[in-house]
Amino acid sequence: MALGKRKRERQLDAFVASSDLPQSPGHPFYTALNRLLAENDFDSFVEELCAPYYASSMGRPSIPPGVFLRMTFVGYFEGLDSHRSIAWRCADSRSLAEFLGLGPADPTPDHSSISKTHKRLPKEVFEQVFQFILRVAARKGLLSGKKIGIDSTTVQANASMKSIVRKDSGKGWKDYTKKLAKEAGLDAPTAAELQQFDRKRKGKKVSNDEWENPHDPDATVTRMKNGTTRLAYKAEHAVDLESDLIVSATMHTGIAADTETVIDTAVDAAVNLEAAGSEDEVKTVVADKGYHSNKVMTLAEELNFETVIPERDTPTNRRWSDKEPATKRAVYNNRRRTKSERGKKLSRLRSELVERSFAHVCDTGGGRRTWHRGIVNVTKRHLMLVASRNLSTIMRMLCGIGSPRTLQGLRGLLQTAWIHIQSHVQPLKIDMPQWGGHIWIAVTDLRLTWSASW
């Protein structure tokens, strides 16, 4: 074999036959995912859903809704947190272009087009897409929803603390600090002196009643999990404790109290389950002690929700003389369920599954920080991340693989074989460059055969 040399200068071809264009064998995971979406007529559903928000005849054709939504799925599966990085990744991969339904000569959508499409479509479209994915799970018999676990986490906003201004005067933090320094006797302080004064002054507090970010007024000053103070939102998940599917994902301001949002999230989960065609209704709501209050216990019982929520530690015994009998009954019923063996088991299961959903969506899925502004746009992006995570869970339950990054090493080889066993596809050739050869995997009468050549 002769040595091939890379051409330093290359003259572009004027004409290229379509048969000479680069072809991709496709990625096994994305191929299986496309098959699942096609089985449920995903493209027809989203095209009909998005049609009212586009002109019926005039104008340049937009990104097909099915392509746009698949690109948001790619963002989750590849751990990409911005439209620019998603567009670059799709343009760089032939297997992803095939997943999007683009031919070898078709350009991938630009990141600006993705952003404009995201802004054009209302939140209701993203909510119905989220419900569609749940409906896919229900058709496969994977969705229950009788017992849900609820918890929340912070999502860092696309806004800086350095840009906050006072609501009454519109002055920034620096001007406000200069005013305080002048009142304290420091005339014309330098930047270093002003920074030192601000760091040492007592009673320093940033209240959301007095301060806001002009670029994203919906973001609030929030204490993050790591102890820092940032402008952020609060994402709340309700997870089906039997299937590990997220049945509700709501977004709130960073300072929204857990006790004020838990019932709304539980009701939203019930609505989504009904829209998905689930035969079961939400019966048990499991949460941590941060969600416990008399109001929550009473309202949950009125809505026929059984709560398993531990009580906060109190230094004194509770008094019931000034409370309604229904409130006392609801609190005691919750206490009995929480202390039972079943309640303890559900609490442990909630901690495992809900925290796992945050790890997948926010940490590995790129959702810990948002590049959108405004609670509506942030909600739309988070709904797509959660819908992608549900797709991942469905794929894992159907064929054992929930992520394209799972297909690595020997385990990935065996899981790839399982995908082809399930779908009865043609023999699959897997190149093994590190071994200097390839492996053929074939399915004949439900019997797996493989051979290697070097």
Task: Label every PLM stretch briefly.
Residues 19, 23, 32, 119, ...:
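Hydrophobic alpha-helical scaffolding
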